[in-house]
C-alpha cells in the first residue's frame, strides 16, 4: 500500500520533516517514491511552515495513496491558507 507520510530530518531538538510518498512497508526514513513537500514545525519569521505540491498530492491520492493523520491535518492547513490568500 502506498502512503503519503512524514520522514524526519533536521538536528536534535530542531525537527524538519519531508512529506514523501512511499510504500507502507518501508522504514520511516527509508526509501521513498517521491518527495511532495516539507513541514517545519519550528518555523520562525519569514520561514514557511508547510510547503506542499498539491497537484502531486492529488495525483497520488487519485491513484490510491493513503494519507497519514498528520499529513491530512497539514493538507487541511495548507488548503485553509490558500483559501484565505485567494
Curated annotation (Swiss-Prot):
Keywords: Ribonucleoprotein, Ribosomal protein. GO terms for cellular component: cytoplasm; small ribosomal subunit. InterPro entries: Ribosomal_bS16, Ribosomal_bS16_CS, Ribosomal_bS16_dom_sf. One of its GO terms (molecular function) is structural constituent of ribosome. Disulfide bonds: none annotated. Gene3D superfamilies: 3.30.1320.10. Pfam families: Ribosomal_S16. GO terms for biological process: translation. It comes from the Bacteria. Belongs to the bacterial ribosomal protein bS16 family. This is Small ribosomal subunit protein bS16. It comes from Xylella fastidiosa (strain 9a5c).
Amino acid at each position: 500500500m502506498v502512503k503519503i507520510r512524514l520522514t524526519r530530518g533536521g538536528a536534535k531538538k530542531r525537527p524538519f520533516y519531508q512529506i514523501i510518498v512511499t510504500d507502507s512497508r518501508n522504514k520511516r526514513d527509508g526509501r521513498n517514491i517521491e518527495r511532495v513537500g516539507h513541514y517545519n514545525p519550528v518555523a520562525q519569521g519569514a520561514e514557511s511552515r508547510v510547503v506542499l505540491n498539491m497537484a502531486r498530492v492529488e495525483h497520488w491520492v487519485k491513484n490510491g495513496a493513503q494519507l497519514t493523520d498528520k499529513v491530512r491535518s497539514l493538507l487541511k492547513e495548507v488548503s485553509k491558507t490558500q483559501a484565505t490568500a485567494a
